[in-house]
């Protein structure tokens, strides 16, 4: 039997703790090597200790000082954009693979069903999981782009206010910037825009996402099939991910000033494609309404498992005497 790959999680908040539970319950290739935080009284560190996972409340330096640090191959960072930049610099001399769940964007953007395979080879040591809104919507933009050029794509991510912890709230600007860039770089849109809404409704509502894309004349059936197929691929690792309504195609009236949204050299556009999504969380640690956090941890887990398989394949087999 091949040994599991050891991982550490920096960030003992909502995302980090949910990710730990996923590794422990669901992964047949990853093993928890450490849970790292900065608050010794955090629930995440307490849960990790109860589950016999090594812990430290001294941040990244505490991780480096752990006895089993050398055995850890992959480090998840579920802190904040600013903290990740410091953590990445501290870990750089040690050759660890970093899976960044913050909007820091040091490494390339990864959305598993779209471009994960592109970043498993080579010398990529830091991959960025974009944002929750990006993980939910960029597959849809990419599905449309696979059929026809997308001149402009706009996404609106509506999440339950209760699911937004201090890290999420501190990174609202980074969320919009990172998601917008990834809509273009990964989704394939010529121009992207992202909006996040923290919904204070009680009881909390499930994550809802809207994707709007401006395209020229194209095969609507082919686009619909591409979107449906992509949704099924995301649902393989996020079972609560689903299309909430049928894909809608709306003709853009003559005189509509959509040219103001388009970058130079694109267009003309004749049709608006509307995709409506809902993401229900698996409720491993967080409530089901926190689909925004669940899709991030699920995407990060899938990415790390793919990295781990590559690591296993590069470990020389023991030579029998």
Swiss-Prot record:
MF-aspect GO terms: acetaldehyde dehydrogenase (acetylating) activity; NAD binding
Documented EC number(s): 1.2.1.10
GO BP, sorted A to Z: catabolic process
Keywords in alphabetical order: Aromatic hydrocarbons catabolism, NAD, Oxidoreductase
Listed SMART domains: Semialdhyde_dh (SM00859)
InterPro entries the UniProt entry points to: Acetaldehyde_dehydrogenase, Acetylaldehyde_DH_C, NAD(P)-bd_dom_sf, Semialdehyde_DH_NAD-bd
Catalysed reactions, as listed in the record: acetaldehyde + NAD(+) + CoA = acetyl-CoA + NADH + H(+)
Record-annotated active site: 132
Class of enzymatic activity (EC top level): oxidoreductase
Protein residues bound to NAD(+): 12-15, 163-171, 292
Keyword NAD: yes
Record's protein name: Acetaldehyde dehydrogenase 1
Organism: Rhodococcus opacus (strain B4)
Phylogenetic placement of the source organism: Bacteria, Bacillati, Actinomycetota, Actinomycetes, Mycobacteriales
């Amino acid at each position: 039997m091949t040994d599991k790959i050891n991982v550490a999680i920096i960030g003992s908040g909502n995302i980090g703790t949910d990710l730990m539970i996923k590794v422990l319950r669901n992964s047949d290739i990853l093993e928890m090597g450490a849970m790292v935080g900065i608050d010794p009284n955090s629930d995440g560190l307490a849960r990790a200790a109860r589950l016999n996972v090594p812990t430290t409340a001294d941040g990244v330096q505490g991780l480096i000082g752990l006895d089993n640090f050398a055995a850890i191959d992959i480090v998840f960072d579920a802190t904040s954009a600013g903290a990740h930049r410091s953590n990445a610099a501290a870990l750089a001399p040690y050759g660890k693979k970093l899976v960044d769940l913050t909007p820091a964007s040091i490494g390339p953007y990864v959305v598993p069903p779209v471009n994960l395979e592109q970043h498993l080879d080579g010398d990529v040591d830091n991959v960025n999981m974009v944002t929750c809104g990006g993980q939910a919507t960029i597959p849809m933009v990419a599905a449309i782009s696979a059929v026809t050029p997308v001149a402009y794509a706009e996404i609106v991510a509506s999440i339950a206010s209760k699911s937004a912890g201090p890290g999420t709230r501190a990174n609202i600007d980074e969320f919009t910037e990172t998601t917008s860039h990834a809509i273009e770089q990964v989704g394939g849109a010529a121009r992207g825009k992202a909006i996040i809404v923290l919904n204070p409704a009680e009881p909390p509502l499930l994550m809802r996402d809207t994707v709007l894309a401006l395209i020229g004349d194209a095969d609507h059936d082919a686009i619909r099939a591409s979107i449906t197929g992509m949704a099924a691929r995301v649902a393989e690792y996020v079972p609560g991910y689903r299309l909430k309504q049928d894909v809608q195609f709306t003709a853009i009236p003559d005189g509509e000033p959509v040219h103001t949204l388009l970058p130079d050299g694109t267009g003309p556009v004749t049709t608006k494609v509307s995709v409506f999504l809902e993401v229900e969380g698996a409720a491993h640690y967080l409530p089901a309404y926190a689909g925004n956090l669940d899709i991030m941890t699920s995407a990060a887990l899938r990415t790390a498992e793919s990295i781990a398989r590559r690591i296993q394949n590069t470990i020389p087999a023991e030579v029998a005497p």
